[in-house]
Every structure is written in C-alpha cells, then in structure tokens.
C-alpha cells in the first residue's frame, strides 16, 4: 500500500472518503461486468467449438465426396462446371453492442442466379450435385462461425481490459485510499488531543 501525498485536513479526508465510495462502486460494477462477460464468453466458446466441429466434418466429408464425383467426370468438364459462379451473394455486416463490446452480426442476401453459369444438374452427376448442395447449405454455418469467432476475440480483449481495471482498483487504488484515510484520521485525532491538552493547560 502507498499512502497518497495529501495534507491531513478534514476537507481532504472528506474528499478521500468520497473517492473511496466511488472506487468501491466502480469496483463492484466492473466485477459484475467481468463476470457477465465471462458467462457469455464461455457460452460462445462452446457454440464456436460445436460449429467448428460441424463445419470441419462437413468439409472433410465433402472433399472426399468431391474426389469421388470428380473421378466420374472428365477433369476439364469439372473445371468448366465451376468456372463461373452460379449465384451472386451480398454480405451485410451490422454491429451490435453487448456490454460495451461492439460485435459483428452477419447476414447474406442472394441477389441473383447467374444464368451464364456452366453448372447445371443436367451436365453434372448425382455425386457432384450432392457436393454442390452440401456446400450451399454450409454458407450459413460458415457465416455464423466467422461471427462467433470474431465476437469471442473481441470479448476476450474486453474481459482482459476489465480484469486489469478490477485489479487496479482492488489491489492499488482502494487500498491506497483506505491507507491514506486511516493516516489522516490518526493525524486529526493527534491534533485534537494536542489541542485538548493545550486548552487544559490554559485553564
């Protein structure tokens, strides 16, 4: 603990007591914020792990299925099938505030189907159709995964900042204020006793 360099006066004592009350209120609010951020963070981490497992599993299975589908078609024909995107997608990224943390919210809009696309269910095979359908169904999961991972990163940063502020108040500011208040109270008591002794001597 470090005693603050202030004059031991009653006015200073009152000021320090107000500062201590404010620091203690701030400490409680920050601890509550940290705990709630941690609760949400843990929930998001669980969702992130589950989503990642699902997406990776789909991608691994789909790559195997694609290898099989590709082996059943001419490689040049496969390249032509995917040479032009079959649809155009707009990605929208909005912002949401969660406990003073600005996090992304993503959604997409299919703006048009590309009529010039080489891919069609007539020119492909059923195996390739399955691969194509699975990849289309994965887009929403991939967007949510990106959203959750970014949110986790931002929340982890905020948790660390809040933790440092809580520790600063708990282990430095509040003890220093308390120590200084105690010191001033002792000094004022000493001054009162000395003053009382002088009065008694005068009498």
Swiss-Prot record:
* Keyword field: ATP synthesis, Hydrogen ion transport, Ion transport, Transport
Family membership, please give it.
Belongs to the V-ATPase D subunit family.
The protein's job, in short, is: Produces ATP from ADP in the presence of a proton gradient across the membrane.
Q: Gene3D superfamilies recorded for this chain?
A: 1.10.287.3240
GO molecular function terms listed in the Swiss-Prot or TrEMBL record: ATP binding; proton-transporting ATP synthase activity, rotational mechanism; proton-transporting ATPase activity, rotational mechanism
Give the signal sequence positions. Answer: none
NCBIfam families named in the record: PRK00373.1-5, V_ATPase_subD
Descriptive protein name = V-type ATP synthase subunit D
Pfam families xrefs:
ATP-synt_D
Q: Which GO BP annotation is one of this protein's?
A: proton motive force-driven plasma membrane ATP synthesis
